[in-house]
Amino acid sequence: MFIAFVAAAAAVASHQPPGAICVSIGQSNAADLQYICESERAWSRAVASGDIDAPTRILANDYVGIGSSGKRFTKAEMAAQPARTSKSVSYSDNDYVRVRFFGSTAMNQGRDSLRTKDGHTSHLIWTDTWLKRDGKWQIVQSQDAELESSNLAADNLQ
């Protein structure tokens, strides 16, 4: 989800809605939706706060992430990233998250805004695949891409 943190922060677009929107497309269990939405937000905010607990909790042990550069990441690598990114990122949060449930699988698509400490803003679009195993929701796969500022208006929740 947030694999290209610092590289993506070079974009110059500056847009942040007043609050993140997290919605279920189709039917969902309210408690599952709330947990996934809160977890996505915690992971995004960890980029700036340095909190390693959020990715450690929500990423499955067999997690594989693909960054916008094509690099693969494991759970251990992703859990360690907030400690590094928080040195250069001052703000990171979800703009929106769309969640689609398919039984014990949830597919999420979202957008995050990031701001570096030197004032550059960037946006990442991402997809996360969640599985509910042994009663616990965790991300097993994610992929992100930097959103060009010229495409920002076209990427909206409506």
Model-derived regions, located:
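A beta-strand edge to alpha-helix "cap/lid" segment located at domain peripheries
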Residues: 13-57, 62-158
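Hydrophobic h-region of N-terminal signal peptides that target proteins for export
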Residues: 3-15
